[in-house]
């Protein structure tokens, strides 16, 4: 079934237990060590009130006659987490990442937000659950980012040399390859808000007052393809290199977490493809969009490959869907290969673009679920 | 029809037991919301039972709005397709009951996108119906039997022939699977298609879709026929949702029709009919009325006083629309019409991009739509319309408890 969380499986089971026998829950996540919570129309019994911080599974059973709602409330009364629609006679596993503190566990029969509650105390610190594989994935990913950024800097140097020599043909040839490393790790670069606009802004995205400060790859792209000359543009090349070096100097102090930076970054890379590359907006003059497209996909694939052992264990169906999704996009891209690169995107017709867009959507949807699978 | 005629009571009875099944199944979640919507929002907010012998959205009182979508299946993996159809069925059962998809739109895991997209939160079920159909290309595409169902293609699911005047756009025609979403609230209909499309990513891709803003047909006996964008009531002699005898004879496929898995199902023909609004509006009232064979104000047939007075075809012009489309001119052929008006802005030449999204259900398109449409070759109305999109789909019987959309085909 669709790679929904164990929670969703439990929810569906309550709705249509017998509607679809094939989709009963392969619900194994919360079974071990779950805290039992028994709700009736006027009571809320919790099996354990001294809890340890971190990922905690509550097994909430509704023995009342009304649809119930389970809430974890912070001391200020705000909701930390809630699970709605727990039908009479059903039971759901609900996973919450608990920080240290005191909380109210509330059962609301009729889902009014009010009802009996129990106080619980949580001690310790919530972390990544100590999964060494994730720590290693994050370390490996950081090493990958460093290598890819070095690659972009090396190739950009050659590109800038050609720009400075006003060798238009050579610069055009080196333009797209110089961007590949960057496009592969773009979400990491975007963590430093100031670098991305300097090196990768498109003219169409600028405010009128920003146009005088425009710099980066796309300025040179326009000069090369539209004006046919980069005479006097050498300073922009130097600045591009300096900005990339600044990014490099910041990497040592950077920590990347598996959920937001890696899984979230993979999703962002596919978003980049879906909104910028498939439409041909990114490389409006050079039409080298497919080179960026491939680099974005490669960047997402690298992240997935690093996280895959964990994903396979926590959501095998998601891993299968992602394997299939990546394979399909890669196969489609192959159709448009030309020499070391890709055909000009303005020669890719509407039907082929639709096919690419469909494949990107097909990959982007399961990819958006990667973070939850890793965080589980 | 050889099987026992269902009769009024059977459909009624099953309709009600279907309702109780849904209520039973929904008891776990959101039932209170359905009941709430029912009491507070009146008829337009009600939920239409999802389970039953026939799919809802065919012999269901016509809702105000439409979102129709045709999908291409992008995988060759039968298991994956079946898995999606099961997921769709779950989602459809939830949405038609006024509940969100999966784990809902809010309150889930913070780092995950919500299962439901959320724009229908707080809206009543709005009589949402979701009706699925399978196009000829699902059974065989480019000579390939992708899902091992080629042999199960119903004889009645023919490729529609070219009709004179057709100007069909491939990007607005065909599709392996179609879903008709009808609701009294357009946001509810759009939400339904959007969420199905999202669940389907990787298995299906939207090929084309169409919004309809106003119904042009009624299946409710005695109700006035809503006007189309030409200002006329057309299709007065529709099949009523209460007329089980006519439904059994002209709408529901039977066991002996050549395709067992379609028994209780129906065939949908969808046509995007562009109307040349501006030239029509310059046409004299007399000519407009002659073209339809009805008067514009009341909708009465030529020579009669009331919309539902029996038409005397011989009194109409030989090329009048009603005369050519009438069952008496087509060997008794009848179809259940469920079309909607659309306006997709303007066409770049300052003209309304508007028309009728025609939908008809029938027991067999060969003796239904194709028969009638062939008669319309000489229709005087053709000067003002053009068929630009087309699809034909086999809509399987309704989902029973424990089943899923298409289970009789993929079993």
Name these PLM-found stretches.
Chain A
Residues 1-10:
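Bacterial N-terminal signal peptides that target proteins for export
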Residues 18-22:
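C-terminal motif of bacterial Sec signal peptides marking the signal peptidase cleavage site
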Residues 24-27:
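Bacterial signal peptide processing site
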Residues 31-52, 154:
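N-terminal edge beta-strand
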Residues 47-66, 92-108:
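Beta-strand cores of secreted/periplasmic/IMS beta-sandwich domains, seen most often
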Residues 69-73:
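Beta-strand signatures of extracellular beta-sandwich domains
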Residues 87-130:
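Extracellular/periplasmic metallocenter environments
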Residues 126-376:
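Mature extracytoplasmic or organellar-lumen-exposed domains after removal of signal/transit peptides
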């Amino acid at each position: 079934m669709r790679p929904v969380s164990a929670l969703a499986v439990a929810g569906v089971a309550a709705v249509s237990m017998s509607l679809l026998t094939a989709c009963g829950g392969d619900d194994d996540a919360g079974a071990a060590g779950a805290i039992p919570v028994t709700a009736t129309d006027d009571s809320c019994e919790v099996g354990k009130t001294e809890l340890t911080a971190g990922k905690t599974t509550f097994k909430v059973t509704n023995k009342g006659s009304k649809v119930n709602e389970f809430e974890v409330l912070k001391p200020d009364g705000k909701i930390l987490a809630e699970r709605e629609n727990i039908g009479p006679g059903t039971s759901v596993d609900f996973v919450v990442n608990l920080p240290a503190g005191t909380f109210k566990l509330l059962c609301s029969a009729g889902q009014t937000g009010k009802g009996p509650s129990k106080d619980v105390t949580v001690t310790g610190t919530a972390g990544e659950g100590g999964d060494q594989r994730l720590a290693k994935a994050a370390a490996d990913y950081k090493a990958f980012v460093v290598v890819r950024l070095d690659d972009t800097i090396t190739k950009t140097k050659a590109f800038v040399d050609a720009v400075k020599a006003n060798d238009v043909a050579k610069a055009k040839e080196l333009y797209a390859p110089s961007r590949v490393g960057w496009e592969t790790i773009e979400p990491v670069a975007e963590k430093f808000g100031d670098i991305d606009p300097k090196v990768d802004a498109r003219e169409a995205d600028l405010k009128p007052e920003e146009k005088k400060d425009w710099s980066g790859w796309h300025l040179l792209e326009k000069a090369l393809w539209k004006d046919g000359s980069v005479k006097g543009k050498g300073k922009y090349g130097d600045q591009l290199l300096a900005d990339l070096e600044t990014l490099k100097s910041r990497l040592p102090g950077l920590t990347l977490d598996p959920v937001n930076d890696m899984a979230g970054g993979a999703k962002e890379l596919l978003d980049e493809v879906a909104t910028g590359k498939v439409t041909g907006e990114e490389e409006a003059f050079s039409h080298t969009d497919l080179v960026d497209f491939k680099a974005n996909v490669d960047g997402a694939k690298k992240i997935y490959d690093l996280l895959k052992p964990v994903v396979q264990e926590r959501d095998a169906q998601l891993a299968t869907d992602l394997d299939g999704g990546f394979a399909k996009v890669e196969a489609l891209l192959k159709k448009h290969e030309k020499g070391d690169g890709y055909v000009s995107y303005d020669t890719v017709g509407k039907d082929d673009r639709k096919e690419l867009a469909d494949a990107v959507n097909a990959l982007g949807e399961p990819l958006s679920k990667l973070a939850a699978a890793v965080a589980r | 029809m050889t099987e026992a005629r269902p009769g009024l009571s059977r459909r009624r009875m099953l309709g009600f037991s279907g309702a109780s099944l849904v209520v039973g199944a929904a008891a776990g979640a959101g039932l209170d919301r359905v009941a709430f919507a029912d009491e507070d929002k009146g008829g337009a907010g009600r939920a239409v039972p999802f389970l039953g012998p026939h799919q809802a959205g065919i012999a269901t009182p016509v809702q105000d709005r439409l979102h129709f979508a045709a999908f291409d299946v992008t995988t060759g993996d039968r298991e994956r397709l079946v898995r999606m159809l099961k997921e769709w069925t779950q989602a459809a059962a939830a949405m038609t009951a006024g509940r969100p998809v999966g784990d809902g739109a809010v309150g889930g895991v913070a780092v995950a996108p919500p299962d439901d997209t959320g724009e229908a939160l707080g809206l009543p079920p709005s009589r949402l119906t979701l009706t699925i159909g399978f196009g000829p290309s699902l059974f065989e595409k480019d000579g390939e039997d992708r899902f091992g169902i080629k042999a199960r293609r119903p004889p009645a699911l023919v490729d529609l022939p070219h009709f004179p005047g057709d100007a069909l756009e491939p990007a607005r025609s065909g599709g392996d699977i179609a879903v008709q979403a009808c609701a009294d609230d357009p946001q509810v209909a759009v939400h339904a298609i959007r969420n199905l499309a999202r669940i389907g990513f990787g298995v299906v891709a939207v090929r084309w879709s169409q919004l309809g803003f106003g119904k042009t047909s009624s299946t409710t006996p005695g109700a006035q026929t809503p006007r189309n964008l030409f200002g006329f009531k057309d299709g007065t002699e529709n099949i009523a949702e209460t007329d089980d005898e006519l439904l059994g004879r002209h709408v529901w496929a039977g066991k002996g029709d050549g395709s067992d898995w379609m028994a209780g199902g129906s065939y949908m023909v969808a046509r995007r009919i562009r109307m040349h609004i501006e030239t029509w509006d310059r046409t004299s009232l007399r000519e407009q009325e002659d073209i339809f064979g009805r008067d514009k104000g009341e909708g009465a047939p030529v020579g009669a006083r009331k919309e539902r007075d029996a038409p005397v075809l011989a009194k109409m012009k030989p090329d009048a629309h009603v005369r050519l489309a009438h069952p008496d001119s087509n060997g008794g052929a009848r179809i259940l019409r469920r079309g909607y008006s659309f306006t997709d802005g303007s066409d770049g030449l300052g003209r309304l991009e508007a028309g009728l999204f025609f939908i008809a259900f029938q027991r067999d398109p060969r003796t239904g739509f194709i028969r009638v449409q062939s008669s319309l070759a000489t229709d005087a109305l053709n000067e003002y319309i053009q068929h630009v999109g087309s699809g034909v789909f086999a809509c399987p019987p309704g989902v029973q408890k424990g089943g899923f959309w298409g289970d009789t085909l993929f079993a």
